């Protein structure tokens, strides 16, 4: 092999390690761990394993704040995905993962491989993926490039999900200028597992073979993890080699073969892990480190699809659709025969050792030999300086924004045409959300619901985060994101169980950004404790900045809940004329961070809406009880656009109307006060519902009507709007903007 790689001396003197992502002090630490200077391959291994993307070195102190335990938790953070118990020996595995940087550079493949990666995380646990969700952020749809990004990201998600046959059942999309050059693509996968089948990513048992399964290794995605741990610049467009290419048909075979091994050969399978960020080095070193073992890998045996690949390239490649298995010795042929049935190659590339070293051999030579824990566990942890940004105090002291409401119906129409509020049908119609035929509530309601075959249960799932509130106040905004996710689950008839969090932030080297991360984590933790929804998995994506401009703090909350009986499934749309409409919760003049403020001022500022977690929990529990007792015909949480938008959305599906008198002034129609629900009840259930809610701030507003007119009164004031007209604006906005 021609030795083109820099020598240890050149690496040190020319500071080549800096280009690979290590700081001076980190390089010194590596030298002291090894007792010598690392060679080129070893320097590469440390640079990628100690990147933020793999080691969480900047975010670990913050992640430790999260509550991660609960009686419902079968598997908490630290494995491919978290798992919660839903009874009857079944569990639900789920996780959210970001693919932000790749999706800006190469939006179709960036989004597609994000979907592929999160699916592998879930089936590596032994769970069958049953649903996908996503949470997307883009800039305003006013440039050809913004429209191109949206179209390609959506096509990438659809292309992969539809081909592999997993329904994409829900998600959320927000448009704000801060995402123009930093789009966010967070994908969530939910899987079903028998509790007895739960797998671990571990390699133990001295002499046990380590097997490589799936696609061959190429040069795609080398340093993808490091690429995700730096700020962007316009030149970043050049980094296309760091974006991988996905093959959903290969992944489908891999999924079925791996689940086959887990189901029928659990006695000989020791551990299984997906090759994700940082590829082979990450999966193999983590599996050995978790088991307190060492590993010896022979790079000559790694299946390669390109010529003359170096050990460095093979270890760091992020080629897709690859898994690593550790099996009991003497059973290699059985495993190979099983994978062959699926047309897949399973190759032994190494074995477990007892010396806790990570040894790489190529052409008979040892090309890397480092302590396995040094790679997987011993990355330095940084307690970054944190500083409250000047804007926070300014927002706290600012005069509250008062909207201009001369023409209430005109404002209503404008709000429904905003892309963050408008119907996302144009987008989700590209996803096959009915494949597998278990989807009980399709996209477009508060939460998606998927039936659990062979039972009367269903799983409710949602993704939520209003990053504008976090920009105003990350602690309150973080709590609101969790509360809103739980509201969506409850409105659908589910009991919230746990969350996965996709923490998307700017550059943590900036003290103001690190402050946002800390405060958001405090808010999320407080809400998770109050609502009993521990954090069981997640992902951190930092450095979402381009040319010094960062995103709003965007911790995406993915939540799963249990619908105990299919009869409890509830949707947001009004069902019958004559049904009685109630509002749960208090409406105040809260417009800061609202869709209305953005529309009228072109910016957001002021104090975030208030959230009282005790009240939130009480209302959620009461509403869920009412739903489980069969008293509720429809329920909808009040979110962006407040009461006006929620009321309009409730009328759209059946083309009904509403005649209501509200307990607040009409200029508060679009206030975004928290902890509110719009509920409709059959007349014969009205008394029982009112009795259940009697001590709370629950208001009887009026009735659902047959005609397609919404009438809203407060004392002497009244506004009237046509459902059909509002609906055509709401449905037409995004197709029109994407033209």
From Swiss-Prot:
Annotated residues for binding of ATP: 56, 95, 501, 538
One Pfam family in the UniProt entry: AIRS_C
GO biological process: 'de novo' IMP biosynthetic process
Main localisation: cytoplasm
The reaction(s) this protein catalyses: N(2)-formyl-N(1)-(5-phospho-beta-D-ribosyl)glycinamide + L-glutamine + ATP + H2O = 2-formamido-N(1)-(5-O-phospho-beta-D-ribosyl)acetamidine + L-glutamate + ADP + phosphate + H(+)
Binding site for Mg(2+) 2: 121, 274
GO molecular function, a single term: magnesium ion binding
Gene Ontology cellular component list: cytoplasm
Residues involved in Mg(2+) 1 binding: 97, 539
Active-site annotation: 53, 99 (proton acceptor)
Localization, UniProt: Cytoplasm
SUPFAM superfamilies on file: PurM C-terminal domain-like, PurM N-terminal domain-like
The protein's annotated pathway: Purine metabolism; IMP biosynthesis via de novo pathway; 5-amino-1-(5-phospho-D-ribosyl)imidazole from N(2)-formyl-N(1)-(5-phospho-D-ribosyl)glycinamide: step 1/2
Keyword tags: ATP-binding, Cytoplasm, Ligase, Magnesium, Metal-binding, Nucleotide-binding, Purine biosynthesis
Binding-site residues for substrate, renumbered to this chain: 98-101, 120, 244, 318-320, 541
InterPro entries membership: PRibForGlyAmidine_synth_PurL, PurL_linker, PurM-like_C_dom, PurM-like_C_sf, PurM-like_N, PurM-like_N_sf
The UniProt record lists the keyword Cell division: no
Record-listed E.C. numbers: 6.3.5.3
Subunit structure comment from the entry: Monomer. Part of the FGAM synthase complex composed of 1 PurL, 1 PurQ and 2 PurS subunits.
Entries under HAMAP family matching the protein: PurL_2
Family assignment from sequence similarity: Belongs to the FGAMS family.
Role summary: Part of the phosphoribosylformylglycinamidine synthase complex involved in the purines biosynthetic pathway. Catalyzes the ATP-dependent conversion of formylglycinamide ribonucleotide (FGAR) and glutamine to yield formylglycinamidine ribonucleotide (FGAM) and glutamate. The FGAM synthase complex is composed of three subunits. PurQ produces an ammonia molecule by converting glutamine to glutamate. PurL transfers the ammonia molecule to FGAR to form FGAM in an ATP-dependent manner.
NCBIfam families in the record: FGAM_synth_II, PRK01213.1
Protein name: Phosphoribosylformylglycinamidine synthase subunit PurL
Species for this entry: Listeria monocytogenes serotype 4b (strain CLIP80459)
Encoding gene, per UniProt annotation: purL
């Amino acid at each position: 092999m021609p030795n083109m790689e820099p020598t240890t001396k050149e690496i040190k003197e020319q500071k080549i390690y800096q280009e690979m992502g290590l700081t001076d002090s980190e390089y010194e630490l590596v030298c002291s761990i090894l007792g010598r200077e690392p060679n080129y391959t070893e320097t590469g291994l440390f640079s990628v394993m100690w990147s933020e993307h793999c080691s969480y070195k900047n975010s670990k102190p913050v992640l430790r704040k999260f509550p991660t335990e609960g009686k419902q938790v079968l598997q908490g953070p630290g494995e491919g995905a978290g798992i919660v118990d839903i009874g009857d020996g079944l569990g639900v595995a789920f996780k959210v993962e970001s693919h932000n940087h790749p999706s800006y550079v190469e939006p179709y493949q960036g989004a597609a491989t994000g979907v592929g990666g999160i699916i592998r995380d879930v089936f590596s646990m032994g769970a069958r993926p049953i649903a996908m969700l996503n949470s997307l952020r883009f800039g305003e749809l006013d440039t050809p490039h913004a429209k191109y990004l949206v179209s390609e990201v959506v096509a990438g998600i659809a292309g992969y999900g539809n081909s592999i046959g997993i329904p994409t059942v829900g998600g959320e999309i927000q448009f704000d200028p801060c995402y123009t050059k930093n789009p966010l693509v967070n994908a969530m996968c939910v899987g079903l597992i028998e509790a007895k089948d739960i797998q671990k990513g571990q390699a133990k048992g001295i002499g046990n073979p380590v097997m490589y399964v799936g696609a061959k290794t190429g040069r795609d995605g080398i340093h993808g993890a490091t690429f995700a741990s730096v700020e962007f610049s316009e030149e970043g467009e050049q980094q296309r080699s760091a974006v991988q290419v996905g093959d959903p048909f290969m992944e489908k075979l891999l999924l079925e073969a791996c689940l086959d091994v887990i189901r029928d050969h659990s006695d000989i399978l020791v551990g299984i892990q997906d090759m994700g960020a940082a590829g082979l080095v990450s999966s193999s070193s983590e599996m050995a480190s978790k088991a307190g073992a060492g590993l010896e890998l022979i790079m000559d045996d790694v299946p390669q699809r390109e010529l003359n690949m170096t050990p460095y390239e093979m270890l760091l490649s992020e080629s897709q659709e690859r898994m690593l298995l550790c099996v009991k010795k003497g059973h290699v042929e059985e495993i190979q025969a099983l994978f062959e049935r699926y047309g897949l190659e399973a190759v032994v590339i190494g074995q477990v050792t007892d010396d806790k070293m990570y040894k790489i051999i190529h052409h008979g030579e040892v090309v890397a030999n480092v302590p396995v824990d040094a790679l997987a566990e011993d990355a330095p942890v940084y307690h970054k300086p944190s500083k409250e940004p000047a804007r926070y105090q300014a927002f706290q002291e600012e005069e509250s924004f008062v909207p201009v409401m001369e023409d209430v119906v005109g404002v209503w129409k404008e709000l429904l045409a905003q892309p963050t509020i408008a119907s996302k049908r144009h987008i989700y119609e590209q996803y096959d959300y009915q494949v597998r035929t278990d989807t009980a509530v399709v996209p477009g309601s508060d939460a998606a619901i998927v039936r659990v075959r062979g039972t009367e249960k269903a799983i409710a799932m949602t993704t939520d985060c209003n990053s504008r509130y976090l920009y105003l106040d990350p602690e309150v905004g973080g709590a609101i994101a969790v509360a809103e996710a739980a509201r969506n689950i409850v409105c659908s008839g589910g009991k919230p169980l746990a969350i996965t969090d996709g923490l998307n932030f700017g550059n943590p080297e900036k003290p103001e950004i690190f402050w946002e991360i800390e405060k958001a984590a405090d808010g999320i933790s407080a809400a998770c404790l109050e609502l009993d929804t521990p954090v069981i998995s997640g992902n951190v994506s930092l450095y979402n900045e381009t040319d010094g401009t960062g995103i709003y703090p965007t911790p995406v909350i993915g939540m799963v809940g249990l619908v105990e009986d299919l009869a409890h499934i509830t949707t947001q749309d009004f069902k019958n004329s004559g049904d009685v409409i109630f509002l749960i919760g208090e409406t105040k003049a809260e417009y800061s961070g609202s869709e209305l403020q953005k529309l009228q001022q072109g910016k957001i500022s002021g104090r975030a809406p208030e959230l009282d977690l005790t009240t939130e929990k009480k209302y959620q529990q009461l509403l869920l009880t009412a739903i489980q007792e069969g008293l509720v015909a429809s329920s909808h949480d009040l979110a962006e656009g407040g009461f006006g938008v929620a009321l309009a959305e409730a009328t759209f599906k059946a083309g009904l109307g509403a005649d209501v008198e509200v307990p607040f002034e009409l200029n508060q129609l679009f206030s975004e006060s928290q902890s509110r629900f719009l509920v409709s009840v059959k007349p014969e259930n009205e008394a029982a519902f009112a009795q259940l809610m009697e001590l709370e701030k629950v208001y009887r507003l009026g009735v659902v009507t047959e005609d397609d007119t919404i009438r809203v009164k407060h004392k002497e004031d009244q506004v009237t709007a046509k459902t059909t007209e509002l609906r055509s604006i709401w449905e037409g906005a995004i197709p029109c903007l994407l033209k």
